[in-house]
A protein has these predicted regions:
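Acidic, small-residue rich beta-repeat scaffolds with periodic aromatic anchors
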Residues: 58-91
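Solvent-exposed strand-loop boundary residues in beta-sheet-rich modules
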Residues: 43-45, 81
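Structural signature of eukaryotic scaffold interfaces centered on beta-propeller domains
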Residues: 4-18, 64-71
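Structural motif
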Residues: 30-38, 83-88
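Solvent-exposed serine/threonine-rich low-complexity stretches and specific carbohydrate-binding patches
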Residues: 49-58
């Protein structure tokens, strides 16, 4: 079975207090494209996975998830027009 997981380095960020690290991944397989984020607590090394897309899509979402930043206590993803497309609060 074909499967490719591509880490999106430009979207991976560490929080201002350096406690949290958010990593974003793009997964391609026979069903299409799926995006997810892993939020790691650097103190406990606990990792929580959050799906960015509810189901597989055949359309590329590269421009839909273009920028990332920590805004206060939220990890926020924005599209190329700077609209918020996903946000994730501290767990």
């Amino acid at each position: 079975q074909y499967e490719l997981v591509i880490p999106q380095k430009r979207l991976s960020k560490t929080s201002d207090d350096r406690r949290w690290r958010a990593e974003v991944y793009r997964r391609l397989d026979l069903h299409g494209e799926l995006w997810y984020a892993e939020l790691e607590d650097k103190r406990t090394k606990n990792v929580v996975r959050h799906e960015l897309t509810e189901k597989y899509t055949s359309v590329s979402l590269v421009d839909f998830y273009k920028k990332a930043a920590w805004e206060g206590d939220r990890f926020v993803l924005r599209d190329r027009l700077d609209r918020e497309t996903f946000s994730l609060p501290y767990p």
